[in-house]
A protein has these predicted regions:
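Short amphipathic alpha-helical interaction segments
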Residues: 30-45
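Exposed, interaction-prone assembly regions rather than primary DNA-binding/catalytic cores
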Residues: 74-159
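Short acidic, hydrophobic short linear motifs in intrinsically disordered regions
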Residues: 18-28
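Short helix-to-turn junction characteristic of helix-turn-helix DNA-binding domains
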Residues: 13-17
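Short alpha-helical segments that sit at the start of domains
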Residues: 1-12
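Accessory beta->alpha helical hairpin/"wing" motif in late/C-terminal subdomains of nucleic-acid enzymes
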Residues: 53-69
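A short, conserved structural fragment
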Residues: 44-55
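N-terminal, charged low-complexity regulatory/assembly segments
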Residues: 163-171
């Protein structure tokens, strides 16, 4: 069974170079090496990493992210809090949708810049990732758009995610 950190690792592998190491991933995504190592094993067992290679099976990853992630990791919302905006409240979805005036979904973070409704991230280091790696942060917010958005938000998030995954596969 995949875990939230597996999705974070998978997304990072999709946008990074093929010369990654567990140590470099640890430094980039703020997930301990032991957790990354176990995550890589689960990703390989799930057929998302090609056996014995450092390549993501992009077709399977896209299928997982677009069709299954919302069921595997249903949104867990909390109360009003300060945090980092996600889903439709963050780039790139924010640029495609009109502001509804409601409190936005945020990953709880005391250093966050926005007041909104807490949304538990796929992995606890998501707010830190958003400060370190804008490209990965965008993929995580698109994934959250798929997890928590209505049909319109999900449709736009799926389209943007597919475009980014397609360009990552071509690189």
């Amino acid at each position: 069974m995949l875990k939230g950190e597996d999705i974070v690792v998978l997304l990072r592998l999709m946008i990074g170079s093929s010369s990654w190491t567990v140590r470099s991933l640890d430094a980039e995504i703020a997930i301990p090496r032991s957790v990354i190592q176990r995550s890589l094993v689960r990703l390989e067992q799930a057929g998302l990493l090609e056996n014995g290679r450092r390549r993501v099976n992009v077709g399977r990853a896209e299928e997982l992210l677009v069709h299954a992630v919302k069921y595997m990791f249903p949104p867990v919302r909390g109360g009003e809090t300060r945090g980092v905006p996600t889903a439709w409240a963050a780039t790139p979805l924010r640029d495609k949708l009109a502001d509804s005036g409601e409190l936005p979904p945020v990953w709880p973070d005391p250093m966050g810049s926005v007041r909104g409704i807490a949304l538990e991230p796929l992995y606890g280091s998501a707010p830190e990732i958003s400060r370190r790696d804008p490209a990965l942060s965008e993929l995580l917010t698109l994934t959250d758009g798929i997890r928590v958005g209505d049909a319109r938000v999900r449709g736009i998030a799926e389209e943007l995610l597919r475009a980014r995954l397609g360009s990552a596969a071509a690189a």
